[in-house]
């Protein structure tokens, strides 16, 4: 079913060069990667993890899935202590890169998403936008079509207060950021 997300995204954004996808245990990213790499192997697929729950980064370093001693709870939708063997195998083979983002970067992304679309994304869903912001800033990207899969709507007012307080610390507003809803 994850391949459907990739197909729909590509149908609506055929010129994308890099696609950023939130990463928890790896199932969503693996499903997208399997489909995407068959259809468009030229597109770079970049997994995105919360710094506090970076199980794939730890697994890549160890060469196999490892259990994290703890995970953060802010981006609870991607808070996974250990990924499965098969998802590790697929993601390790098919993802072109993985980026970690801080809670402050996630908060800034949630605000950008709200400012552009009037949608309140959950922290785990905003990981991909936070990664695009970070990637553009670190690599001085200009004129490239970057895509981000944004999913999830599980948030509450307590989380929103935290986002409001922390977003300025991760905020480096990008004038080039444009968020478009895909049907």
Give the positions of each predicted feature.
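Glycine-rich phosphate/pyrophosphate-binding loop at beta-loop-alpha junctions
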Residues: 1-93, 134-142, 146-181
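Active-site-adjacent helical/loop segments in soluble small-molecule enzymes
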Residues: 2-4, 84-143
């Amino acid at each position: 079913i994850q391949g459907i997300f990739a197909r729909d995204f590509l149908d609506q954004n055929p010129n994308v060069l890099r696609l950023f996808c939130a990463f928890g245990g790896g199932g969503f990213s693996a499903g997208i990667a399997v489909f995407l790499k068959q259809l468009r192997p030229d597109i770079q697929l970049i997994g995105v993890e919360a710094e506090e729950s970076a199980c794939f980064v730890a697994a890549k370093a160890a060469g196999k899935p490892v259990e994290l001693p703890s995970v953060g709870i802010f981006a609870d939708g991607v808070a996974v202590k250990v990924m499965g063997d098969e998802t590790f195998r697929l993601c390790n083979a098919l993802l072109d890169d993985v980026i970690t983002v801080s809670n402050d970067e996630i908060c800034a992304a949630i605000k950008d998403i709200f400012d552009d679309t009037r949608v309140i994304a959950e922290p785990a869903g905003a990981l991909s936008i936070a990664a695009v912001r970070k990637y553009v800033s670190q690599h001085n990207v200009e004129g490239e079509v970057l895509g981000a899969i944004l999913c999830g709507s599980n948030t509450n007012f307590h989380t929103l207060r935290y986002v409001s307080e922390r977003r300025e610390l991760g905020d480096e507003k990008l004038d080039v950021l444009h968020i478009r809803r895909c049907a």
